[in-house]
UniProtKB/Swiss-Prot annotation:
Pfam families: Herpes_UL16
Protein name: Cytoplasmic envelopment protein 2
Transmembrane segments: none
Keywords assigned by UniProt, alphabetized: G1/S host cell cycle checkpoint dysregulation by virus, Host cytoplasm, Host Golgi apparatus, Host nucleus, Host-virus interaction, Inhibition of host innate immune response by virus, Inhibition of host interferon signaling pathway by virus, Inhibition of host STAT1 by virus, Inhibition of host STAT2 by virus, Inhibition of host TYK2 by virus, Interferon antiviral system evasion, Late protein, Modulation of host cell cycle by virus, Viral immunoevasion, Virion, Virion tegument
Family stated for the protein in its record: Belongs to the herpesviridae cytoplasmic envelopment protein 2 family.
Signal peptide: none
Organism: Epstein-Barr virus (strain B95-8) (HHV-4)
Amino acid sequence: MASAANSSREQLRKFLNKECLWVLSDASTPQMKVYTATTAVSAVYVPQIAGPPKTYMNVTLIVLKPKKKPTYVTVYINGTLATVARPEVLFTKAVQGPHSLTLMYFGVFSDAVGEAVPVEIRGNPVVTCTDLTTAHVFTTSTAVKTVEELQDITPSEIIPLGRGGAWYAEGALYMFFVNMDMLMCCPNMPTFPSLTHFINLLTRCDNGECVTCYGAGAHVNILRGWTEDDSPGTSGTCPCLLPCTALNNDYVPITGHRALLGLMFKPEDAPFVVGLRFNPPKMHPDMSRVLQGVLANGKEVPCTAQPWTLLRFSDLYSRAMLYNCQVLKRQVLHSY
């Protein structure tokens, strides 16, 4: 029994280290620090939680430092006590930038013998900016312009995400974005101008509860530090989104937002594109390798690559996008 308990606690420690980004709570005091983290349902760590299943994992962390004793932590997940333990080390680092996030590393847990177990005191996350914007992405990402910049990545480590222009490789998220100069020329651009978002707007169905088109019940926003019970769990920006018509088909019809086609095809082709056809999802800095347009007569026309740049996300935002989504976790974070 002790061995099983230790194994479960070690899994919890790894979950806290590998699937959580933290936000300080206003319940904190000089004697007690309280943090919260919200993350999509884990594909690895499955705790015993009271009550019905949730589509999110809300974590409350209470850090106490008794006089003349080492620090100990109390962890609640979705309101259920997960552990009271003394970490061998506890490193914290505030993330510079607009999101009020804190990185943490928990060393090996041991029993916190004789310590009081505080009740869950959540308070409210102290947050400033709760959205990942285009400006955040552009100022922290690296443009990938040549095949040579990708040649050091082991091919087997490249994981395609969705069907249109997103990959995860060796700890980083790669996505196509509209070039900055095009954004300045097009003020009505979608707020998150990734190729995956364009494809989603162009081809999604009209059922807002569709999991594949809208991500219903599969997403959180880690930047908020907490997910409410009534959250629909949808996303407009996650690269997991793909039209439900593409689940078993390389061809998908255009269903709306036709004005976006002007940034994907030549002016003489864009008005007549009625569908998209996806190519095999090999990562390449040329957007035209991802898909092509299909005209009413069945003819295929190439995409225009010039308005698009492949971006390698920063470690922080790669983690944020990954932790937001059950689907991405199952694809990328299925063991540790």
